[in-house]
Amino acid sequence: RVLKLPFILVQVPSPLDLSIRCNSSEAVLLKILLWNSPSFTSSITMYSLPLFTSIKTTLVSQNSYFNFFLGLAIKSCSLNFCLNSNNLGLSVINPFSLSTWVL
């Protein structure tokens, strides 16, 4: 029983500090696609155990921005992620929260 949520697309400046925290009672599949041109795609996939799980990474684009594409397929999960950039513009999205979406 997996709930597939709508995709979210935002544009954020580079460099991008990406922090994802997931606190779930069940296994979670989280896939993130970052791209700034047809020739560049960075994919992050996180499988969480039934414990607190977090990932943090910094991505640098050759251009001045990233297109941020977030696709989620979750069971029962409380998910928070934040985007922080050293540049001006869309610098912070914190938090984006999903809690207890179960079919």
From Swiss-Prot:
The keyword Mitochondrion applies. Keywords: Mitochondrion, Plasmid. One of its GO terms (cellular component) is mitochondrion. Its main location: mitochondrion. It is found in: Mitochondrion. It comes from the Eukaryota. This is Uncharacterized 11.4 kDa protein. It comes from Claviceps purpurea.
